[in-house]
Swiss-Prot record:
One of the Pfam families matching this protein, by short name: NusB
Function: Involved in transcription antitermination. Required for transcription of ribosomal RNA (rRNA) genes. Binds specifically to the boxA antiterminator sequence of the ribosomal RNA (rrn) operons.
BP-aspect Gene Ontology terms: DNA-templated transcription termination; transcription antitermination
UniProt-recorded name of the protein: Transcription antitermination protein NusB
Classification via InterPro entries: NusB-like_sf, NusB_fam, NusB_RsmB_TIM44
GO cellular-component term (any): cytosol
GO MF entries: RNA binding
Gene giving rise to this polypeptide: nusB
Alphabetical list of NCBIfam families matching this protein: nusB
Keyword list, A-Z: RNA-binding, Transcription, Transcription antitermination, Transcription regulation
Family stated for the protein in its record: Belongs to the NusB family.
HAMAP family on file: NusB
Amino acid sequence: MKPAARRNARHFAIQAIYSWQITKGNVAEIEQQFLSDDKFEEEEHQADAPILAAPHTDLNYFHDLLNGVVQNHQELDSKMRPYLSRPLQDLDQMELALLRLAMYEMTKREDVPYKVVINEAIELAKIFGAEDSHKFVNGVLDKAAPTLRKK
């Protein structure tokens, strides 16, 4: 699978994870909404966002990321807690979604190099996060990587 297809899967997954966090909705319904809303066909996006189309998105990876984060969110939260400078409940919901996604990839998807996980999380934070979210996400993941992944 091409790296761009996984990047697109992450792009959709972060939005779906954020939606799940905000609504606490059924993850299968959220996933179906993303699959049926033509989001994989034509996504209105910022100029620097990737072009998102079904042939260019790894749908299996999207499914794995979304469901993996939802099913393991408590474990992921406990793994990130030691690296946070503030309580989990004080995190912005998008920062929390970004960190959960990255922690999932770092701990459950060892086929993805940790440097790729960190770089992709930073890029997503630049697109979806607040002004300095990418710096915060980078700091947390840089501290967590040596413990969670043997470099």
